[in-house]
């Protein structure tokens, strides 16, 4: 559960309505793989991840980033039940994929950076604070199965 004020909920919702999930999802996942290269081990089937350009232009990275952001978008409509919303994904990433739950936090922080880059001055400190709460809540929900 994420505790947001009315102002924070409005800020998150207003900005998210302008997000191009295809573009932002691919960029966020791509940046995660470039900035934290050890995360690439979970994506060995994606082909060439040998350089930043290869990662950022990889169609499988872009497609999976879109999928990830689609799930995140779904979570935004269930902020009062993030653990329930992400229960299946938590189980998948824990039991089958064995993803280090710290990677969820890293991806959330990368997403905040990408949103700031895309929205510039519109991504005010108030908006950032609200999104930091949301990505922390999502990361916590995804890590729930690990506890």
Swiss-Prot record:
One of its GO terms (biological process) is hydrogen peroxide catabolic process. PANTHER family: HEMOGLOBIN FAMILY MEMBER (PTHR11442), HEMOGLOBIN SUBUNIT BETA (PTHR11442:SF42). This is Hemoglobin subunit beta. Heme b binds at residues 64, 93. Residues 3-147 form the Globin domain. The modification N6-acetyllysine is found at residues 60, 83, 145. Belongs to the globin family. Red blood cells. Pfam families: Globin. The keyword Membrane does not apply. The modification Phosphothreonine is found at residue 13.
């Amino acid at each position: 559960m994420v505790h947001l004020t009315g102002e924070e909920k409005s800020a998150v919702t207003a900005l998210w309505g302008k997000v191009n999930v295809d573009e932002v999802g691919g960029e966020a996942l791509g940046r995660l793989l470039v900035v934290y290269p050890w995360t690439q081990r979970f994506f060995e089937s994606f082909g060439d991840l040998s350089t930043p350009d290869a990662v950022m232009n990889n169609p499988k990275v872009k497609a999976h980033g879109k999928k990830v952001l689609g799930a995140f978008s779904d979570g935004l409509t269930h902020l009062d039940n993030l653990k329930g919303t992400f229960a299946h994904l938590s189980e998948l990433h824990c039991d089958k994929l064995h993803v280090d739950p710290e990677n969820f936090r890293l991806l959330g922080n990368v997403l905040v950076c990408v949103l700031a880059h895309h929205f510039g001055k519109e991504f005010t400190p108030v908006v950032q604070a609200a999104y930091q709460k949301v990505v922390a809540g999502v990361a916590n929900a995804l890590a729930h199965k690990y506890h």
